[in-house]
Amino acid sequence: MPEDAAQPTGRRHEKYDRLITAAQRMPAIGMAVAHPCDTVSLESAVEAAKMGFVKPILVGPAARVRAVAKEAGLDIAGFELVSSEHSHDSAAKAVALVKAGKAEALMKGSLHTDELMAAVVARETGIRTARRISHCFIMDVPGHADALIITDAAVNIAPTLEEKVDILQNAIDLARALGAPEVRVAILSAMETVNPKVPSTVEAAALCKMADRGQITGALIDGPLALDNAISPDAAAIKHIVSPVAGRANVLLVPDLEAGNMLAKSLSFLAGADAAGIVLGARVPIVLTSRADSRSEEHT
C-alpha cells in the first residue's frame, strides 16, 4: 500500500497486480479446499496453483470432484484428493487437515459458508483461537491510489464494541502483513461527530481511546468519520477535519455487516473494483468464495 492515498492513479488493477506480485514472491502453501464440487471453486484452486500461490488439497466426494474437473477441462492429476461423503464431511476433513498441520490455508468450495465455519469454530475439533474471527475485503478501486481494506462485511452481523476490537486488530495485522508502510484506520459512521443517539459514533470514540491506551496497536486510528471524509482529502478539508487519517484511510471499519457488504459490493459492481476476501482470526487464513465472484477475485 503506497504512503499517499490522496494521489489518484488511472491504471486499472494496479493494486491488484502488486498484491499478486507480492504473493508470487512467497513459497506456495498447502491449502485445503473444502467441497470443490462446482466449476468456479475448482477452477479457482487450479488457477491459484498455476500462479504459484498454493498446493491445493481437494476435499470432497472423489467421483464428483473428478467429474467436475473432466467437464471443465481441468487437470487435477497432480493434486492430493481426500474423499468425503458429503459437504459436512468435506468441511470437517478440510479443517482436520489444518489442525494436523497438513494445510496452511483453508478455502470454501461449493458448500454453505455456515457449514465450513461451523467446522472451523467447533470446540473440540475446530481451529479457532482466542481472537474473534472476522472477514476483510481488500479492494482495488480504480482511481484510488491505495488499496482499501473493508471490515467486517461477511462474518460478524452486528458486532459489539468488544468484538470490534478484535475485528479491527485483525484488519490492522492484515494491512501490515501486506506491507503497508503506515496503517490508517477510519472508523466509519454516518457522521464525524460523536452523537449519543448514534451508537456507532460512541463506539468509534471508545475504540480511538482504546488505541491511545495501547489496547489496539499497529495503526493510526480516527473516528467517527463519514466515508467521504475518510477517503477524500477535499471532503475532510471542507469539514475542517485535521488528522493523519482523514482523507487518507487505507482501512475502513464499518458499523455492521449490512453497511460493509453494501459498501464492498457497491465498489465492485458500480466502480469496477477488484476484491480479494479473507477470513482472519482462526489458526490459518480462510478464503470464502461467493457465487457472484469472478475467477480473479476468487484466486486473489
What are these regions (language model features)?
Residues M1-I57, P61-H299:
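Anion-binding alpha/beta catalytic cores of soluble intermediary-metabolism enzymes, centered on
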